[in-house]
Amino acid sequence: MAAANPFKVTDLVAKYGWQFMGYLANLGVNVPRNAAVIFVDSAATNATDADDTEHGHSFDKPCATLEYAIGLCTDGQGDVILIAPGHTETITTAAPCTVDISDLTIVGLGVGLNRPTFSLGTNTAATINVTAANVTIKNIRVVSALANVAIGITVAATATGVWIEDCELRDGGTSILELVIGISLAAAATDATILNCDFLTVTGGG
């Protein structure tokens, strides 16, 4: 489902000026002219998962979840999702957060523990599931909130060209809350890049 009211690059420039394009370039994000840019921040007072003329168009009125924001994107368009520092999101079911939009770039803002954090819990099959080609994921934290969570980020055979950079995948602070596999790549997921990622466990963890 693409957004009924997409916030395009032209809207971004009209609202924030051309300097915002320089900001995106500094993040290593190349935004095509026709792409949509969607903002996500669970901590914002006005955060709502709604496809209207306001939410997701700025950090003043962002979407509340990455999962919803993905559903607003268009396949093959080069859309970008920006996730605010301090964003938190819990993935709790076996029907995971699925990145099924090709040429999508997801960028977390912030540093250290302030980076967007995705907690996997309730079901050991909870995961961020990448199924589309040419997906980029940058600067997020994926943390186990349950014993023996199987996989942090699952890359399917259809997700050729995936790029995962500057991400942290880790146990949930104790050896009990173990993340068994940080990133799982299907054998047919060719042209994958995993760059500058941290895979962390605690004493007694796996």
Model-inferred region functions:
Residues 38-44, 64-90, 104-110:
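Glycine-rich repeat segments that build the extracellular carbohydrate-interaction surface of secreted
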